[in-house]
């Protein structure tokens, strides 16, 4: 009888393991191969060798890159050096990046580990750059003022909160106010790994302001990129491991109401909103297994989607760029400016293409 119970227990454990393993592989799109889609006149951005996980383009063409991310379970080509914020002017004939000096003595630069970024332009044209950072595996939002003439960032404030344990991306709605995605419920790396493997869908979106902090959406399987429509009425949320983008209606009190969901055959990462058309440009991972289990002989590919008329009954989804990893590995973000497409990656290079 004891042997029978033991065998039954082993069988149940193996069955659960098999089911979870199959689900895990499906969520990571483990068996997908990339069908290449090329763009003309693409050049690698000089000076970016350790990733450009997120980027933000200002209306004047100045572009911020967050680079050097160290993230649990993800490859890093420069693990011993702190991250940086880089700047590039897309109006130049041959744009090149330069590191932005960070002014003030309130930020520990040795542990600076930038992830998602977002800008907010005040009524007096002051540019604020909000940066997700992971010092010592924690999560903070660092608030900077961009000093254009000096080509520097003035550190103003560090934001932490118990409802922000594992921030991935942010969408600024004020100098110190934003929506943030938590890609995990837990902050502890061990618990995070089980949360992800079991597909618990406990990640969420938080609205933060100096006066009020609240969870405004939850139930996500790795909430990732977030963006806001040009008219400010809608919030777009990428659910990485469910291969979905959610559209929420934003209300005057900053709460969100679900409106619609789009599904894809790729892992959707950061979302950029076209400043002219309102289209969504999305950096994607066609095969997530190759991101989380890196093999230089079989590297992760890259994919960029353009989503037009997302609020309509029949949105148009176009694969604008796709590549198997020989040029660009692990695309996380894409954004446009005057006929140019910038593509960033989690740990690799960045690419600039003509559209």
Curated annotation (Swiss-Prot):
SS bond list: 42-353
Extra information: The preferential association of PON1 with HDL is mediated in part by its signal peptide, by binding phospholipids directly, rather than binding apo AI. The retained signal peptide may allow transfer of the protein between phospholipid surfaces.
PANTHER family assigned to the protein according to its UniProt record, in alphabetical order: PARAOXONASE, SERUM PARAOXONASE_ARYLESTERASE 1
Positions annotated to bind Ca(2+) 2: 54, 117, 169
Post-translational modification summary for this protein: Glycosylated.
Sugar-bearing residue positions: 253, 270, 324
GO annotation, cellular component aspect: extracellular space; high-density lipoprotein particle; spherical high-density lipoprotein particle
EC number: 3.1.1.2, 3.1.1.81, 3.1.8.1
Full protein name: Serum paraoxonase/arylesterase 1
Locations listed in the record: Secreted, Extracellular space
Lineage: Eukaryota, Metazoa, Chordata, Craniata, Vertebrata
Reactions catalysed, as given in the entry: a phenyl acetate + H2O = a phenol + acetate + H(+); An aryl dialkyl phosphate + H2O = dialkyl phosphate + an aryl alcohol; an N-acyl-L-homoserine lactone + H2O = an N-acyl-L-homoserine + H(+)
Chain's role: Hydrolyzes the toxic metabolites of a variety of organophosphorus insecticides. Capable of hydrolyzing a broad spectrum of organophosphate substrates and lactones, and a number of aromatic carboxylic acid esters. Mediates an enzymatic protection of low density lipoproteins against oxidative modification.
Principal place of residence: secreted
